[in-house]
């Protein structure tokens, strides 16, 4: 039995501790199932599409307000009051959710289109035309239906099934769906309906008189009516203007007229009766008859919208259930009838009772008014000295928090500025539970000054009143001004009445015995009201006929039912099927039956593939060598085409490509296009191809590319001809941009109707007098174009200047054999080179002009190559061997030579891949070199709608050669190129920093006078190019036009503020734009874009890093310099420049937002607000909760604004919060650890890693206790400490487990943004008495000295009393040429995480160093279970383990623990250098070392929340360790230095001077500016937003080194 109980207890304990795997698995499974159920429940929510454009804040408002829906925000529709408009649909759906589905529902003033779209066939909408806007709104609803149906029709879709019933009902019986009567007079019939009837009123009850509402509901037999309307509690006050901030709307009241409108919008306003709305708000019962009444019940308020419901109540039910056994029933009923008559009359009278008589009802109906008070604000006129007064609603808690605090101010401190400072501070942030800082009270910022004046006056009067009471001052005769001040004092005394009292006092409402009387001004009629009433007419709204659409929908549904028998019918593309039926004019049912027959193999046709992929279709279209037996095979066939001569006789010319837009799979030409004259007078329609989508190309990839190239020429010619025909038809409506590209000649008048920019066009489109359009080859004389008599007009364009596409088509058609292009067997080599790698230079060095051919894309490039090749005076490059691609294609066969040995194509990747294949074939070469850049701008398909598949863009080559040295680009651009190219890109340029950018205020600021641009001017878009040319700039090109060109200086301009797709980080256009210059590039832009970010990154690249990209940088000279200056820092005195604003700017860039905090009163607000704390077992002396008041001396005020806090006052609350956040918040992460054995192994590793081999064993001849050691310890102590030992007899040991607790009054600044949301905990100090320190201090001092003497100081640095110079010496021999990993271990809550295991490790280290067993045991027990006493704050508690922050082993103990921790996890035998100091560590390992999972090991073994960081530079004890090629320099953290300059605890000027000297000591190295660049990089690693900071480093040196100048950083607080 005992064994069973033991086993049961053990199992229970394991379960509680989480060690039972079965229970853990069950818990995980349960958690998983719960999460799945929760997500499934969320997915089942109704889905609502929010199409209107709203901000992120408005998105959160809608999502939080309506959790019942799954809202999808598309942000695709810009509209007025977009949030309110979008919420209208959510409000409608919320109201409809309250109604049982299918129940007859009346939508009062509703939107019948919304119900049709939702498929609600059971809703009837009463939509009376009470105003012109109502008619407009109703027409808009019908337009939305018509638009919806037209979209379905355009997409060959039909009304979905769930909408079909509703649309059928509207098509057949529109009066059943919507009527235009008021709800009170609605004639809708409820025949054949027996269920309950419901109604909804969405923002429509304003116009229904409240006295008629109940009767109207009863007339329609409505069971429950759900309503929603806008309202604000402030309308019950005297305010004539009330804002609804969430929806950006407002109410304006003028007498009984209440106007609703949206702010900052020109939409029409809505006017209602204020008294009528007030009845809906204040009344509870709405009588319907002498028996039934509708009772209003408030539901919820969401986003300025109130929801309520009106339930039908039968009042006769109040007494029908009364028991009457044992009495005379007749007498009972008679008495009840009399009583009921009286009670019913009283109930009807009480139905008008105001709801505000009950305070709980007020809080229920007006939740925003809860805990709000009315505060008067005062103002005075400077001209008339007239005082004015108004009232505002403010949180009661906020008011009394301010008043109670400022009431404690002394007379001298009670000033308006101090009150305003406190009010502004607590309004911006309040400390919650001593942890979180947040804004607690939402008080309008515009009221803070007036409120502060009110609080100040109130407190002044309260102080005066107290003085009068104390002195028992007797009042005598009073002057008028004294009476006025008495009235003000009286108003202040009654500043906070309840809402009810204020309403009654202002006579807004009047309470009578039986009813609520609302007093409003008499009604009046304005001119606008009179005009509307005179011309008001009532007409019936026309009905929208949708019967035809419903019939088409029915046919489509029947066809889809036929198709449902197919396999995978759920994936059937209904849109394509509907489009096919419409284009072929086929009945959907017939088409469906044919498809089913084909797919069921019942049509006699066998399909050769299942999925119509490109590969399957191409395979199916190939001719089969041998058909399978018994199978029907469909193959392509040759189709005879009419001859060219026959076509010319009819004026037609068929130009379809190899795979054009006709059904045949291939073409064979019986006759070829022999000359360009065959194009003359061909009809334009024969050249225009409306459908540019090719069928599948067949053959190898190169053949497919060549076919696609021919098709692209056809498409380009077709587009050019089509545009010219359109110009001829629309000459009178040509915009300015089109006029620059086209020209139209009137033949009769010989005058250009639209003058072209070019002259002597080669061809054009002619319009004859018969309104026919033909393509004509043009001839010119001295008067212009030679025309014919039957020509009416001639149109030309920039594409018709030359016969480009026509001549290319003629040439390529001659090359086809049986309709198929031939592929060359020549070897194709791709030379992939970076920008400026010398591709043209290499071509000229390799080419043999006698037997090779060079082809380039542009004429300028061809002329440049000829000029460079013939520079020696010998003509070797001619127009026969250096040609443009277009010239070669257009004039093929006309030159003297047709065959070449080698072909060189410059910028070949800018060409169509099919064009490159044709060039290789036409040159008849043995090898072709295609020079290009895979990362620059590729071939761009200029014909919209013409397909150029992605796999066609890749050129098939036999070999790839790379060129990765740029002769053009400066070093910073080369740095960018290394991010885009594989392999190392190098440069030969001596320029390092060449790129810059400038943000311009707008496109208008770019003009030649105010902004002359240097060098070549480039743009990204043609529109920007034209804009610059029109403003007077010369020689402007786009980036695409200058690819391959080189310029010394470039000015890149962007004038387009809208997003441009080609401006992206990985865009080839950006790459080309950055690589055109050799000296400088400046980017002028009107908006921030990725290129600005790239240039800013390049500006920050250090110069020494850019030297790595130079190919001509030798290493021998560097090695010689390195050997001379080894271990010595270059010293360059830092100039003393800068100002205070430099330090402020740098601080704000690194820590944005910290300097704006108003945290001077954080400690005050924590004491003033309620607080809830979770504490461990402790004893609190509550008599210490109220600190004794102290005179606070003013401190110096810093000019540099940082997040530094004011010193805090020690007290119960402050000390307890610090203890909770520090000592009571220790992590528990460790797993199961064998403490003694593991500690022994860790210490073994510690001694093997850090101690010299000969000193790993303790010196037995060494005594820890000696007079010398005690004298050394005493010499380090202060006289006060020694005086405390005077009465110590040293007979017995004091209580070693007793500690004292205190806090540091000055909070430690964190160099992050946590101060914006957190209340930093003070550092706690737990320390022994001096008597214990006198015993163990000398002991551990000797142990520490012995340990440090044994450490391998060449590799390890235990930072104890080391100067920055000693740190520099330690790291000075690091070889910067050896790649290293710089590691930092960051441990959170280091002291409080240490438990029994850490103590065991530390005790084992001390034991091995020679600590005696007895003292070791005493020390161990003194750190096991310890008692903490805080006498100042009145706190006593017990702690287990933890590092005590004030005993004699705090620093060295933390140091050996962090060193032991790292030795147990990292391969210390590979370590190059390592430094340890408290919880800080810095390690240098060789690059590429493998490390274990540090986080897991630190958690499970060491109970540490640890993170391991890899960095370029080390950060150690608040200092940056910068290693370089000459040694090492240690810079104090400049951001930490600036943070200290914002200190708010400096007492006086003497204290400030001591403060300056201490900062000078730690920041001495900043005087050396030689390594500021590396310091910038180091700071940038920690603070990503930090700018280059040499200016601020110099500023710090300037102020720290000058005593007088340093005083200007602070102001005297006593004089402020």
Curated annotation (Swiss-Prot):
Residues 801-963 form the (+)RNA virus helicase ATP-binding domain. One of its GO terms (molecular function) is ATP binding. GO terms for biological process: DNA-templated transcription; mRNA modification; RNA processing; symbiont-mediated suppression of host innate immune response; viral RNA genome replication. Changing residue 979 to H: Normal tomato Tm-1-mediated resistance (AC A7M6E7) leading to impaired infectivity in resistant tomato plants. It comes from the Viruses. Changing residue 979 to D/K: Overcome tomato Tm-1-mediated resistance (AC A7M6E7) thus leading to increased infectivity in resistant tomato plants. It catalyses: RNA(n) + a ribonucleoside 5'-triphosphate = RNA(n+1) + diphosphate; ATP + H2O = ADP + phosphate + H(+). Residues 50-458 are annotated as: Methyltransferase. Belongs to the ssRNA positive-strand viruses RNA-directed RNA polymerase family. This is Replicase large subunit. It comes from Tomato mosaic virus (strain L). The lineage of its organism: Viruses, Riboviria, Orthornavirae, Kitrinoviricota, Alsuviricetes.
């Amino acid at each position: 039995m005992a064994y069973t109980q033991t086993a049961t207890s053990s199992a229970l304990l394991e379960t509680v501790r989480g060690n039972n795997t079965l229970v853990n698995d069950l818990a995980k499974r349960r958690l998983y199932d719960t999460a799945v159920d929760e997500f499934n429940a969320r997915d089942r929510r109704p889905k609502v599409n929010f199409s209107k454009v709203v901000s992120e804040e408005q998105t959160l408002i809608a999502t939080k307000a309506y959790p019942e829906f799954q809202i999808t925000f598309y942000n695709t529709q810009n509209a007025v009051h977009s949030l309110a408009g979008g919420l209208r649909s959510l409000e409608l759906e919320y109201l409809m959710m309250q109604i049982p589905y299918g129940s007859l529902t009346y939508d009062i003033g509703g939107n019948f289109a919304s119900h049709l779209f939702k498929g609600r066939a059971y809703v009837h909408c009463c939509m009376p035309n009470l105003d012109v806007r109502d008619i407009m709104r109703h027409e808009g609803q019908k337009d939305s239906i018509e638009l919806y149906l037209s979209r379905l029709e355009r997409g060959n879709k039909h009304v979905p099934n769930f909408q079909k019933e509703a649309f059928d009902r509207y098509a057949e019986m529109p009066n059943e769906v919507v009527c235009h009567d008021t709800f009170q007079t609605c004639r809708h019939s409820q025949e054949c309906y027996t269920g309950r009837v419901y109604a909804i009123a969405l923002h429509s009850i304003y116009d229904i008189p409240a006295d008629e509402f109940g009767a109207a509901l009863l007339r329609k037999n409505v069971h429950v009516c759900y309503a929603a309307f806008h309202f604000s509690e402030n309308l019950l006050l005297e305010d004539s203007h009330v804002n609804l901030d969430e929806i950006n709307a407002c109410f304006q009241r003028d007498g009984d007229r209440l106007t609703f409108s949206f702010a900052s919008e020109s939409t029409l306003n809505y006017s209602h009766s204020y008294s009528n709305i007030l009845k809906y708000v204040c009344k509870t019962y709405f009588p319907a008859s002498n028996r039934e009444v509708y009772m209003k019940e408030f539901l919820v308020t969401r986003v300025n919208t109130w929801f309520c419901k009106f339930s039908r109540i039968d009042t006769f039910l109040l007494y029908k259930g009364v028991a009457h056994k044992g009495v005379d029933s007749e007498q009972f009923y008679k008495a009840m009838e009399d009583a009921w008559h009286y009670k019913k009359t009283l109930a009807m009278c009480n139905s008008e009772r105001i709801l505000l008589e009950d305070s709980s009802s007020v809080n229920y109906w007006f939740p925003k008014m809860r805990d709000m008070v009315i505060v008067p604000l005062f103002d005075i006129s400077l001209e008339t000295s007239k005082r004015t007064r108004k009232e505002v609603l403010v949180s009661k808690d906020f008011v009394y928090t301010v008043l109670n605090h400022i009431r404690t101010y002394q007379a001298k401190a009670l000033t308006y500025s101090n009150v305003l400072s406190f009010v502004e501070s607590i309004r911006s942030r309040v400390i919650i539970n001593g942890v979180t800082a947040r804004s607690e009270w939402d008080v309008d910022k515009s009221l803070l000054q007036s409120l502060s004046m009110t609080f100040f006056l109130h407190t002044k009067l309260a102080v005066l009143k107290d003085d009068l009471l104390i002195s028992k001052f007797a009042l005598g005769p009073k002057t008028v001004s004294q009476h006025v001040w008495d009235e003000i004092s009286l108003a202040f005394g009654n500043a906070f009445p309840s809402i009810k009292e204020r309403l009654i006092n202002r006579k807004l409402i009047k309470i009578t015995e039986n009813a609520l009387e609302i007093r409003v001004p008499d009604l009046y009629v304005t001119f606008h009201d009179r005009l509307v009433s005179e011309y008001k007419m009532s007409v019936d709204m026309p009905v929208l006929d949708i019967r035809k659409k419903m019939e088409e929908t029915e046919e489509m549904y029947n066809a889809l039912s036929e198709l449902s028998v197919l396999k995978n019918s759920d994936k059937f593309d209904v849109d394509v099927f509907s489009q096919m039926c419409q284009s072929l004019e086929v009945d959907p049912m017939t088409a469906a039956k044919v498809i089913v027959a084909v797919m069921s193999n019942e049509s006699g046709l066998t399909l050769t593939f299942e999925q119509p992929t490109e590969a399957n279709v191409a395979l199916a279209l190939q001719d089969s060598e041998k058909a399978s037996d018994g199978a029907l095979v469909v193959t392509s066939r040759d189709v005879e085409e009419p001859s060219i001569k026959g076509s010319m006789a009819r004026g037609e010319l068929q130009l379809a490509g190899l795979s054009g837009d006709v059904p045949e799979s291939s073409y064979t030409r019986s006759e070829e296009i022999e000359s360009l004259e065959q194009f003359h007078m061909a009809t334009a329609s024969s050249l225009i191809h409306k459908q540019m989508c090719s069928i599948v190309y067949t053959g190898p990839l190169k053949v497919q590319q060549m076919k696609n190239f021919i098709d692209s020429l056809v498409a380009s010619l077709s587009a050019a001809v089509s545009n010219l025909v359109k110009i001829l038809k629309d000459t009178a409506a040509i915009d300015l941009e089109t006029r620059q590209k086209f020209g139209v000649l009137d033949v009769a008048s010989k005058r250009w109707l639209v003058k072209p920019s070019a002259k002597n066009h080669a061809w054009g489109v002619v319009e004859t007098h018969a309104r026919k359009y033909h393509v004509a080859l043009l001839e010119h004389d001295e008067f212009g174009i030679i025309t014919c008599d039957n020509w009416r007009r001639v149109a030309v364009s920039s594409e018709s200047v030359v016969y480009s596409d026509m001549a290319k088509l003629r040439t390529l058609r001659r090359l086809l054999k049986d309709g198929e292009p031939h592929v060359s067997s020549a070897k194709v080599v791709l030379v992939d080179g970076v920008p400026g790698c010398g591709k043209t230079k290499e071509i000229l060095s390799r080419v043999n002009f006698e037997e090779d051919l060079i082809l380039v894309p542009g004429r300028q490039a061809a002329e440049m190559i000829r000029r460079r090749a013939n520079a020696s005076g010998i003509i070797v490059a001619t127009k026969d061997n250096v040609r443009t691609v277009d010239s070669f294609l257009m004039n093929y066969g006309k030159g003297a030579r047709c065959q070449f040995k080698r072909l060189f194509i410059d910028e070949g990747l800018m060409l169509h891949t099919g064009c490159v294949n044709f060039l290789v074939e036409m040159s008849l070469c043995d090898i072709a070199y295609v020079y290009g850049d895979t990362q620059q701008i590729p071939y761009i398909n200029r014909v919209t709608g013409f397909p150029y598949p992605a796999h066609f863009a890749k050129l098939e080559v036999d070999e790839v050669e790379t060129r990765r040295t740029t002769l053009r680009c400066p070093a910073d651009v080369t740095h960018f190129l290394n991010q885009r190219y594989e392999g190392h890109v190098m440069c030969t340029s001596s320029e390092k920093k060449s790129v810059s950018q400038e943000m311009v205020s707008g496109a208008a600021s770019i003009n030649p006078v105010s902004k002359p641009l240097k060098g070549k001017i480039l743009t990204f878009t043609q529109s920007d190019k034209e804009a610059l040319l029109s403003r007077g700039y010369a020689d402007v090109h786009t980036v695409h036009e200058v690819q391959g060109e080189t310029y010394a200086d470039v000015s890149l301009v962007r004038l387009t503020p809208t997003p441009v797709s080609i401006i992206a980080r990985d865009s080839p256009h950006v790459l080309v734009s950055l690589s055109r210059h050799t000296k400088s590039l400046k980017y002028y832009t009107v908006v921030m874009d990725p290129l600005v970010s790239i240039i800013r990154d390049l500006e920050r690249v250090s110069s020494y890093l850019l030297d790595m990209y130079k190919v001509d940088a030798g290493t021998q000279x560097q090695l010689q310099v390195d050997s001379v200056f080894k271990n010595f820092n270059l010293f360059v005195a830092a100039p003393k420049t800068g100002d205070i604003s430099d330090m402020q700017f740098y601080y704000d860039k690194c820590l944005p937002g910290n300097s704006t905090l108003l945290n001077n009163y954080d400690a005050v607000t924590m004491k003033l607000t309620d607080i809830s704390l979770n504490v461990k077992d402790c004893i609190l002396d509550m008599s210490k909760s109220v600190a004794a008041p102290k005179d606070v001396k003013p401190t110096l005020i810093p000019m540099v604004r940082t997040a530094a806090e004011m010193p805090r006052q020690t007290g119960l609350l402050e000390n307890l919060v610090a203890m909770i956040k520090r000592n009571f918040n220790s992590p528990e992460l460790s797993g199961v650890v064998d403490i003694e054995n593991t500690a022994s192994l860790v210490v073994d590793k510690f001694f093997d890693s850090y101690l010299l081999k000969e000193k790993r064993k303790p010196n037995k001849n060494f005594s820890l206790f000696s007079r010398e050691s005690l004298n050394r310890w005493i010499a380090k102590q202060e006289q006060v400490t020694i005086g405390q030992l005077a009465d110590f007899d040293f007979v017995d040991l004091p209580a070693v487990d007793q500690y004292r607790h205190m806090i540091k009054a000055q909070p430690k600044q964190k160099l992050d943004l946590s101060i914006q949301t957190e209340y930093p905990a003070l550092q706690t100090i737990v320390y022994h008495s001096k008597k214990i320190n006198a015993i163990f201090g000398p002991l551990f001092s000797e142990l520490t000295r012995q340990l440090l003497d044994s450490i391998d100081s060449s590799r390890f640095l235990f930072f104890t009393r080391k100067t920055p110079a000693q740190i520099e010496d330690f790291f000075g021999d690091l070889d910067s040429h050896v790649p290293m990993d710089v590691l930092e271990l960051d441990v959170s809550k280091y002291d409080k995480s240490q438990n029994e295991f850490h103590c065991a490790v530390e005790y084992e280290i001390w034991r091995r160093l020679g600590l005696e067993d007895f003292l070791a045991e005493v020390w161990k027990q003194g750190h096991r279970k310890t008692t903490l006493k805080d006498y100042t704050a009145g706190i006593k508690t017990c702690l287990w383990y933890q590092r005590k922050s004030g005993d004699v082993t705090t620093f060295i103990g933390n140091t050996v623990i962090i060193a032991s921790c790292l030795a147990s996890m990292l391969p210390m035998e590979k370590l190059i250098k390592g430094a340890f100091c408290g919880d800080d560590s810095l390690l240098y390992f060789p690059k590429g070392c493998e490390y274990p999972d540090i986080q897991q090991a630190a958690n499970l073994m060491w109970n540490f929340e640890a993170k391991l960081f890899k960095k370029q530079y080390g950060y150690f004890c608040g200092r940056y360790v910068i290693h370089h090629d000459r040694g090492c320099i240690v810079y104090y953290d400049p951001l930490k230095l600036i943070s200290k300059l914002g200190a708010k605890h400096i007492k006086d000027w003497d204290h400030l001077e001591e403060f300056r000297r201490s900062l000078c000591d730690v920041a001495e190295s900043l005087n050396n500016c030689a390594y500021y660049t590396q310091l910038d990089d180091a700071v940038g690693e920690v603070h990503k937003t930090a700018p280059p900071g040499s200016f601020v480093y110099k500023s710090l040196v300037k102020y720290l080194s000058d005593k007088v100048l340093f005083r200007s950083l602070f102001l005297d607080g006593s004089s402020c």
